[in-house]
Amino acid sequence: MEIKVTEIKENKLLGRKEIYFDVIHEGEPTPSRKDVKGKLVAMLDLDPETTVLQYIKSYFGSRVSKGYAKAYESKERMLYIEPEYILVRDGIITKEEE
């Protein structure tokens, strides 16, 4: 699995960086969210507690998936802005923490 960052936008109003990337997975199934997030965080030197993987989209017959992640400046801002289901899906909070 290889990740190529296609665009990084600074969103000062929401206090985050918006990261668009391609995941190249030749001869492999689409990688898990956990694997992609781990590699992206390590590659860009981000904090895993304030980084949210919004989506990974795979297209039939393609060996490349497209993804979108958001890296927040603080955990408080992330918890205020992001929908609960995204935080649960990324493992940042659990369902019981509501």
UniProtKB/Swiss-Prot annotation:
GO annotation, biological process: translation
InterPro entries given in the database record: Nucleotide-bd_a/b_plait_sf, Ribosomal_eS24, Ribosomal_eS24_CS, Ribosomal_uL23/eL15/eS24_sf
Keyword Lyase (UniProt): no
GO MF term set: structural constituent of ribosome
Record's keyword terms, sorted: Ribonucleoprotein, Ribosomal protein
GO cellular component, as recorded: ribonucleoprotein complex; ribosome
Family: Belongs to the eukaryotic ribosomal protein eS24 family.
PANTHER family from the UniProt entry: 40S RIBOSOMAL PROTEIN S24
Name listed for the protein in its UniProt record: Small ribosomal subunit protein eS24
Organism, scientific name: Thermococcus onnurineus (strain NA1)
